[in-house]
Amino acid sequence: MQYLQPLSAASQEVKTEQTKLAELAGRKVDYQVQDKHYELKANEMLTSVRYIDGKYQFDTAALKNKINEINQAQATLGKTFTFTTSTGKTIQVPGKTYGWALRDSDVIASITKAYETGKPSLNAVNDIYGIGYLTYGTGYDTTLNGGLGNTYAEVSIADQHVWLYKNGQQVASIDVVTGKKSTGEDTPTGVWYIMYKQSPSVLRGSSAGSGSYEVKVNYWAQFTNSGCGFHDASWRKNWAKDAYISDGSGGCVNVKPSEMPNIYNNLSQKEAVIIY
């Protein structure tokens, strides 16, 4: 059996560890999340630190708590949005796929690496995530309108109407037909986002009582994981205000072919789609 002599406090290895720990304890990172800055001091964010065999070992419990605090204050993923409609009503709309949040593991990796290397500042843009088609989050680049921004699509089920806004200016206001209420195929309410656009496109799916379908459309902009989106509906004859009740779509927002080009051209990937 080999006996290892315990290290003395005066050994070079112990001195190196002490120096490394002292250097790290004095470091701090200016962490920017959107328009806010957080000074994250290593001696406050790291509950304990060890330096063994040339590597740091961190207890990041305090940093995790700080991440949660920032998410509570700023993140929009899964939150309920306060929204003022085009008709002047203030309503609450639950967040669905739209939004962003800080991912604990990514933030911890970024901050601890910055502590190790002495990097003084970081932007959280690389540490966020989202859900749905775009897993890196949506809406991080704006704090306007409660995080919804000033470029968005608004859909009123009761009014069977769509409004589009671009940089705060209304660029479209049209009547539409949404999902069939009588069969439970209502267009899903909540705050979504434009996942992608395609022109032309072939839509495939099924609807209650009609079986499966495959239909070509000239313009398609999807906003839910389940396959709902905006599209032209050349086959539709009934555009009445109450058509959606018993003659609605399978969940999509049907737009008149003559009006769909303007809708398509004024929708952008990642923008919020607010449906109520």
What role is predicted for each listed range?
Residues 1-215, 267-268, 274-276:
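Surface-exposed, secretory/extracytoplasmic low-complexity segments enriched in Ser/Thr/Asn/Gly/Pro
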Residues 64-65, 79-80, 189, 205-276:
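Exported/periplasmic cell-wall-interacting domains
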